[in-house]
Amino acid sequence: MGSGAAAGVCVQPADASAAERVRALSLFKGGFLRDPRTTPERHATSRLPPPGASGLPLPGRGGRADIQEEADPMTDRECVELLQWAAPRLRLRWEGFRRVRGQVCKRIGRRLKALGLPDAGAYRARLEAEPSEWDVLDALCRVTISRFYRDARVFEVLRHDLLPARLESLRSRGEATLRAWSAGCASGEEPYTLSVLFQLGLEPRFPGVRLALVASDADAGLLARAARGCYPRGALRELPRAWAERAFPGPGDEPCLAPEFRRAVDFLQQDLRSQMPDGPFHLVLCRNVAFTYFAPPLQREVLSRLVARLVPGGLLVIGGHESLPEGDFGLTRAAGPLPVFARTDV
Ligand SMILES: C[S@@+](CC[C@H](N)C(=O)[O-])C[C@H]1O[C@@H](n2cnc3c(N)ncnc32)[C@H](O)[C@@H]1O
């Protein structure tokens, strides 16, 4: 398990130069490894059509603020239409972006400006003409919101019930390692939460056990931030206070995670649609990525592959607002209404 067991680029969090290597790869390799947000943009002069020229309503255009943001080449509606058209081609579902589209639309707007394109229609034409632009759009569509201890009730049930039961059973078999995977780990908030929970919440009760944690994400820029391990205080607000004080001892607005909480985590750059670590895992966190943004057929494919990477009785955690696709995937609920499932079919 871990870096050796999986295809993809591995970053050890304590190794800043490795993080830089991932970043450099993302800039030079192209394809899914490309991170256009870190690519210098060509600044074009605005070639906006006059207001209303697109024939669509004008939300967000025409007011004073809009004069300041005159260079914004897309209305919200144009962006929505672009996403509705493009998402299926990326095996994504537009509905997942509905509530969080602001972040994505802003990025696409910046991309249009960088390319000197006047509107969403011109961007569609660019996509049709240049297949490599789809990789750029794909990367622009990644929603990056995360925080420590997100969905606190899930971490509480893991800490008090589900993981102690798993550790008891490991111990009874003479095993000492809990293997876990955070899929779509953003800047490390989720895997580091698990690392802190394990060390401060579980190790004192189960001395001698260890956590081996793989964390994967498609986005090299986020993985570089994860490797750095420093966060605005707002990202820590749900973490139990005593743990936050232990894990982030430094002063300032952007404290850094203490080294002992980083050691358990191996970061991998992988696209969940095509790559996964081998496993098997006792615990997989796949929250606010596949079951929000992926198209239903892809959700089913990914779910089958996730389940195949769980040990018998292994746990799958999804996001608080997500549900699993219909069908028998060999899972049962493991924590009442909370989005935690256990593998049953083995
Ligand atoms: C909304 S964040 C969720 C982060 C964390 N799991 C949580 O719930 O707080 C979604 C993450 O999934 C990543 N992501 C999106 N598409 C992906 C893909 N195809 N493969 C791997 N990671 C992906 C994004 O880069 C982003 O970091």
Task: Show where each model-derived region lies.
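Extended basic-aromatic, gly/pro-enriched interface segments that bind polyanionic ligands
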Residues: 183, 204-298, 323-325
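Conserved beta-strand signature within the Rossmann-like core of class I S-adenosyl-L-methionine
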Residues: 313-320
